Amino acid sequence: MAIVKMKPTSAGRRGMVRVVTEGLYKGAPYAPLLEKKNSTAGRNNNGHITTRHKGGGHKHHYRVVDFKRNKDGIPAKVERIEYDPNRTAFIALLCYADGERRYIIAPRGIQAGAVLVSGAEAAIKVGNTLPIRNIPVGTTIHCIEMKPGKGAQIARSAGASAVLLAKEGAYAQVRLRSGEVRKINVDCRATIGEVGNEEQSLKKIGKAGANRWRGIRPTVRGVVMNPVDHPHGGGEGRTGEAREPVSPWGTPAKGYRTRNNKRTDNMIVRRRYSNKG
């Protein structure tokens, strides 16, 4: 894929950068793998806002993606690469030799016609899924499980990947894009290569309306609110924050560590912010 800078034919097009999608399938998605997706607009069952800045947006179906890749030893042919509105990565439709079809996260470099396999005996080839114990040290991987059989949870977004650093006993050490080094059970599965659509990070939406299409509502700064609404609010005329940046509920907004899961602390070998002061 490549990117294209749009000509400034209007205010909304000026500065817009898009990802070229010539290689993507232009037809309708595979219907048996679609599910209804209800929009909550950031509200809970009482109608109260639980997540700000959500609402509206285009309706779309959820594409059921196979994160487990548990059809071992059965070759699957890539039928097509598709756009998925639910994630930044593209998805690939696989047709297995027994006739079953499944969606997977499309790895970088995969094209229609490629043949993929999963299982302990699979070759070390981009798109194949194996247990980590069968993957050589130094291999770039993505779609990594955190618990055996649960399905991929790590490195699933566009351009994401991780590197297998070492294997010792029942655990392997994996370095994530954030710099964090984490221990993963060697029976967990991972896919060879990195996620495609790496140019996603270079995209510029060009106008506010593009965010509204995505269901993202405007974000109001705290300094322009009243004191009752935000800790930064109030003052006569334009004033600064007068304190460290915080959320509407007083939680520090810059660099404050919010992780609170001591049960799995021993699985983190090196924290992602270990080089920050």
Curated annotation (Swiss-Prot):
Cystine pairings recorded for this chain: none
The entry's keywords: Ribonucleoprotein, Ribosomal protein, RNA-binding, rRNA-binding
Region (Disordered): 37-60, 223-264
Basic and acidic residues biased stretches: 229-244
GO cellular component terms given for this protein: cytosolic large ribosomal subunit
Database matches in Gene3D superfamilies: 2.30.30.30, Nucleic acid-binding proteins, Ribosomal protein L2, domain 3
Family to which this protein belongs: Belongs to the universal ribosomal protein uL2 family.
NCBIfam families: rplB_bact
Protein's name according to its UniProt entry: Large ribosomal subunit protein uL2
UniProt organism field: Neisseria meningitidis serogroup B (strain ATCC BAA-335 / MC58)
Higher taxonomy: Bacteria, Pseudomonadati, Pseudomonadota, Betaproteobacteria, Neisseriales
Gene of this entry: rplB
